[in-house]
Amino acid sequence: MNDISSNTIQKEPFSIKHIVVSGGGQYGLTMYGILKEAHAKGFWKYENIKSMYGTSIGSFVCLIIILHYDWDILDRYFVERPWEKVFNFDLHTIMYAFENRGLFDQINFDELLKSLLLGKDMPINITLKGLYEITGIDLYITTSEVTNFELIVLSHKTHPDWRVLDAIYASCSLPIIFSPIIKNGCCYVDGGLFSGYPLNLSIKDGCNPDEVFGIRKISSNQREPLNTQSSLFDIVKHIMLNAMKSFNIIPLNSIRHEIIIYGNHTSFEGIIRFSTSKEERNKLIEEGSDIFTQFYKGLL
């Protein structure tokens, strides 16, 4: 199990109104497990949630929560679905990557979410504005625009006509693994480049820190050194990680309810392991449940 730390002071009753979820690759399932267990224990309630902030896989997790499915349905979706058919990796994938600017593209990614939208009678082309009108929850998604090299926050307020699927994909487009999304002359990649954990955005928007529940994944500083056996992905990963370290230097606000997950860096191998192993996916979810249970004991 991953090491965790927590910052908690307040006793029950809890009044969580805002949820912030960082990037974290395959650890998105751990974050899902945390939120699932937190809901089961009454730490947060759907009817109280006003806004959600997500970066990269965190934006995916936020959308999953906003759609308000039964947890059993989501468990089956994550564990039983044949993810290896969505992320099929073979020689064709490698050859296609050079032309497509990434191993996988939005077609692969849309497969992850369209069934969940359709299951709630939402069109697959639903916009951020349309999602807000149905759910009443503000969803803020970070992405990195590389043409102007700046952080972009997508929401129904600033980008109402963006498709939800485009916004989530733009936030999750880790270079090399996913091709970037290009719209109106702008190129969008993973939101973690400039804002791996959008906690400060929530506070800047006026969220009461005592009403924010933050889930943050921090990667180990240990990395395999580059050598003659290193792959193109290894090199790009080092560049991205160093860039993220350089750009994510603004001190984070302090909140009472925060869980920090310590784990490995997002890797191609980790994504493949996630997509091909039911046991791995179930393990990540159960770890999230255990992490929140330990966190919750500190509140009582």
Feature roles, as predicted:
Residues M1-T55, L63-L300:
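Patatin-like phospholipase
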